[in-house]
Amino acid sequence: MFIEHQRIRFTPVPGGSTGVAQRLTLDDGSDVFAKLTEDGPEGISTAEANGLHWLAEAKAPVPTVWCHTESLLVTDWLEPGEPTPDRASELGRSLASMHRSGATRLGAPWPGFIGVLPLDNRGLDDTSATLEAPGSADVLHLESSRHQSEPDSAHGTPVVPTVDWPQWFVLRRLEPFLKLSHDNGALDDGDTALVSTTLARVPGRAGPPEPIARLHGDLWPGNLHWSTDRCWLIDPAAHGGHRETDLATLALWGGAPFLDRVLAGYQEVWPLADGWHDRIRLHQLHLLLVHTARFGRRYRDEVLEAAAGV
C-alpha cells in the first residue's frame, strides 16, 4: 500500500489545472502520481476517485487509485508515450465497451466536479440539495460504486433507455453553466438569449433514444494520456449520460490524434446511430459552456458557433 512506503523523491509534473501534480518515487523504486488540490473545493478528489473506480468496473483504461482524501488523489504513474494509429483504434474499442457497460441512471450517486466547478449529478426529477458520495469522506480507499444496468443477454447492451436525456442534459449540463457564464460576463444578455433559444431546440435535435452510457464526462483531447503501450483516460467527471457526448468532445481544440481511427474502432464494437455527426455541436455545447463559466469570454465565440450549429 502507498501509505506503507516512504516517499524519497518528489518530481513536479506540468499541466495540472486543478491542483499541484507530482511524480512520487517510493522507497521500493516504484512511482505513483499524486495530485493535491488543497485550495480546491471540498470533495473534488473524492469525486474523481469515485469516477475512476466506477469506470474501472467497466474495465476502462483508467489509472488505478491507490488512495485518496478530500484533497489528495494518488494513482498509478503512467509513462508518457506517443499516439499511434493502432493505439487510437484500441482507444475507440475501449470507449465503446466502457459506454456499453451502462448505468442505471443519468448523472451519478456522488456530488460531481468538472475541473473545479460543481457538476450537478442529480437525476431529472431529483430536487434534493445534493447527493451523498458512497463511503466515508475520510477513508483512503473507496469501495467501487455499483450502479450499472443489466446487459441485454444477446448484445451486452444496457437496457435502460435515455428517454429523459434531452431534458436532463439541458437542466443539469447546459443551464447551470450558461447561468455562470452570464454571471461572470463571458456571455452578455444577447448571447445568453441566443443560447437559451438553442436549449429549447435540444429535445428535437437529440436523435433517437439510447441506453444510458457510462461516460468519462470531460473527454477533451487533453484528458487522454498516451502512454508507451496504450491511451489512458484521466481526470474524469464520470456519470451516466449519452455516449455521443464523450465522442463529440474528443473533436474539440484540434481534436484527438488519429480521431478517425478512434471513431472507426468505436464503430466496430458499438455502431453509432444515424445522424450522429449532425449532433456533434449539440454535445460539445456542454464543455464549451464549462469553459466560458470557468475561463471567461475567450471561449464566447466557440459557444455561439456551437449553439448556431444545433
What are these regions (language model features)?
Residues 1-10:
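Juxta-kinase regulatory segment immediately upstream of eukaryotic protein kinase catalytic domains
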